[in-house]
Curated annotation (Swiss-Prot):
InterPro entries cross-referenced by the UniProt entry: CaBP1/2/4/5, EF-hand-dom_pair, EF_Hand_1_Ca_BS, EF_hand_dom
Residues reported in the UniProt entry to bind Ca(2+) 1: D41, D43, D45, D52
UniProt subunit comment: Interacts with CACNA1C (via C-terminal CDB motif) in a calcium-dependent manner. Interacts with STXBP1. Interacts with MYO6.
GO cellular component: cytosol
Any one Gene Ontology molecular-function term assigned to this protein's record: calcium ion binding
Binding positions for Ca(2+) 3 per the UniProt entry: D155, N157, D159, T161, E166
UniProt lineage: Eukaryota, Metazoa, Chordata, Craniata, Vertebrata
Domain EF-hand: 28-63, 82-99, 105-140, 142-173
Inactivation phenotype: No morphologic changes, but 50% reduction of the sensitivity of retinal ganglion cell light responses.
UniProt keywords, alphabetically: Calcium, Cytoplasm, Metal-binding, Repeat
Location in or out of the cell: Cytoplasm
Name listed for the protein in its UniProt record: Calcium-binding protein 5
Length: 173
């Protein structure tokens, strides 16, 4: 099916989720969507910015192209005021969630992987934690320089650690 504005528009057509569904989302799927949404709703106001949408979609296992994100961003700014609430997010994600259920990495799996690296559970992976995890999980002893390079590449905000959002971005590359 072709849409005049490109493939990402499947998310934005009015009522498309209803037409595309072969089945309704199960409670587990809705719970996973809500959990992922809340993870990115940093100020807990019930909205995420269109800028966070790409990261959130990656958390859900869908790897949008830059073109899709650009199209979604343009549409969200025009149609949804630049912010997405949970209901809009469910409508955006339902077709993809149903189409790509097989083989997806869900938020729980991503969080479990993060916890393997975040030894002290403070929500941040430090250089020392990464070095220990690499040795424990992969049997690889990386040099301090190699560990620093990995963290530097993933550390978007420059605080010297890798938080969950940065971990998701790193894992989706």
């Amino acid at each position: 099916m072709q849409f005049p504005m490109g493939p990402a528009c499947i998310f934005l057509r009015k009522g498309i989720a209803e037409k595309q569904r072969e089945r309704p989302l199960g409670q587990d799927e809705l719970d996973e969507l809500r959990e992922a949404f809340l993870e990115f709703d940093k100020d807990q106001d019930g909205f995420i910015s269109y800028k966070d949408l790409g990261n959130l979609m990656r958390t859900m296992g869908y790897m949008p192209t830059e073109m899709e994100l650009t199209e979604l961003g343009q549409q969200i700014r025009m149609n949804l005021g630049g912010r997405v609430d949970f209901e809009d997010f469910v409508e955006l994600m339902t077709p993809k969630l149903l189409a790509e259920t097989a083989g997806m990495i869900g938020v729980q799996e991503m969080r479990d992987a993060f916890k393997e690296f975040d030894a002290n559970g403070d929500g941040e992976i430090t250089l020392a934690e990464l070095q220990q995890a690499m040795q424990r999980l992969l049997g690889e002893k990386l040099t301090p320089r190699e560990i620093a390079e990995v963290v530097q590449e993933a550390d978007i905000n420059g605080d010297g650690t890798v938080d969950f959002e940065e971990f998701v971005k790193m894992m989706s590359r």
